[in-house]
Amino acid sequence: MAAPLAQQLEELLNPRPDLRDPEDDAEEATVAKVIDRFEDETADDVLPVGNIRKKASVSLLEADQRYSGKATSRKALQEELWGDALSEEGSAEEALDEWYSGSEDSEDNGSSGSKTEEQPSSAGSDQEDNLEDDEERDSSAKAPKFSFQNITDFEKFAEGMDDVGSSDGEDEDDASMEEGSDDEKYEGENHDHVKDTNDNEDDGGVMTFSKGQTSDEVEKGKAVKNQLALWDQILEGRIKMQKALVIVNRLPQPDTFPLFRKEGGQEFDSAVESCCKAVDTLLRVLVDIQDELLYQCPGTRHLVDGKQSKPESDDEIPSSSDEERAGEAQEKRKRPPKRKLKAEDIPEFIAKRYSDYRTYRNHILQKWHEKTKLASGKMAKGFGAFERSILTQIDHILMDKERLLRRTQTKRSVYRVLGKEEQDSHPVPEHLPENSEVLPQADSNRHLKDIDEEIFDDDDFYHQLLRELIERKTTSLDPNDQVAMGRQWLAIQKLRSKIKKKVDRKASKGRKIRYHVHSKLVSFMAPIDHCTMNDDARTELYRSLFGRMMQSEGPERGWHPGPPAPAGSAPYTL
């Protein structure tokens, strides 16, 4: 509503500025207001109970039933605690009313008579003292003092002590009863919840699951450990047979064998016969080892005993009946059947065994190739479509049979075949021409071009096996092996440095001195010189100083003087 015109003119003519109170907000929505409390609200709001107190109350209830409470009212509590004192309260109030009425009558009578006027002032003071004493008695009667003498039933007192002082007046009896019932219900629910939790913990379901998982992992670890131990033993046998293979490659070949037999006589024939028996025995031992390994595996047992095995699923989870039958068969016959093979039948037997084993081999290779491929994450790369399966790669390599045979017939190590003349080696020139800047390299790979059809040399594959064995032995991470852990840490740091190099941007333009820290002396050993120049290059450098070149020592081996020194130059010596 707009103000009157006179008030508006007065405000315009008034030179005093209008200072409004920021608290006076004209808007009704944003003006500050005082909200009255509701009638059912109390000053003492019920605060939430913490988890510690809840657990403590539950433990007390489980320990002793005397701590269990019950819903009651303040009036009933007072009657239980001090019933006699409350019954005497009414009589005390009646006596106090009679005393007040009697004192008023005595005052009226004293004012009208002459006897009251003659009383001394001390009588008035005595009456006042008596009045104060009566008031004290009245207050004590209204609020009787608490004493253990008035309490006869201490169990009821202990049960009701928790509810004393929970409310302030007798008007809140109903509210206190409702709150008591709610608290009792909440405590009951909490108690049931705690019991359920304890029951779940006592069941031991999680403990049993973790033990099962641990036992499975332990069994897998033991199986892998046994496989590695078996592989090490096979490699050890392969290393021992390598010596025999090298000796066999040095034996006389068919073109020179009759000459050796003629010259050797009976002693040569007996040595050849004993050698053939040893080779035959070795072949039979290898066949027995192969049968033993194939017979222990359920997937390849049919290759030994001839019984067709059932097709296995991808998950390879044998049933209990299969395990029982396998256990019974293992108990009845723990070893594969013995074979009686002649020496001339062994090559055919090995070829047939390889053709039968190839199906199982391809299945295992394909399965583990897919598992490792998924685990390594190679499927997610962009060029995954161009990758071929492991079986396709093997077939592609085996297609070139001539190349594979030529690699096994290549002489890779240095040894001399008996009865065969060695080829003359190309001499390496001792002196170099004057204008030659590149030193000739020795023909170190010349023996790789020497192909002999009568030998079998697989040194490249043998060296690869040895390299893998040494790497696995040296990089086996033992928790107690600090050296291996240090090597692994250095390898990881090296890979990290390759990924992201740390560049000091403030070290450019000569703002930081560049230096290399010399390594510490180990057992008083001189530091190793990491210079790229060898001794021959240094010698050639020192000899070519000051325009002179000395190719040999002494005048008899030839001196090649350089150009004459300029006049006035200082003499020099080498």
From Swiss-Prot:
The lineage of its organism: Eukaryota, Metazoa, Chordata, Craniata, Vertebrata. It comes from Gallus gallus (Chicken). Part of the small subunit (SSU) processome, first precursor of the small eukaryotic ribosomal subunit. During the assembly of the SSU processome in the nucleolus, many ribosome biogenesis factors, an RNA chaperone and ribosomal proteins associate with the nascent pre-rRNA and work in concert to generate RNA folding, modifications, rearrangements and cleavage as well as targeted degradation of pre-ribosomal RNA by the RNA exosome. May function as a general inhibitor of the histone deacetylase HDAC1. Residues 187-198, 302-312, 322-331 have a biased composition (Basic and acidic residues). It holds the Pfam family AATF-Che1. Residues 86-97, 126-137, 168-186 have a biased composition (Acidic residues). Signal peptide: none annotated. This is Protein AATF. Belongs to the AATF family. The gene is AATF. PANTHER family: AATF PROTEIN APOPTOSIS ANTAGONIZING TRANSCRIPTION FACTOR, PROTEIN AATF. One of its GO terms (cellular component) is nucleolus. Residues 82-205, 302-340, 553-574 are annotated as: Disordered. Coiled coil: none annotated.
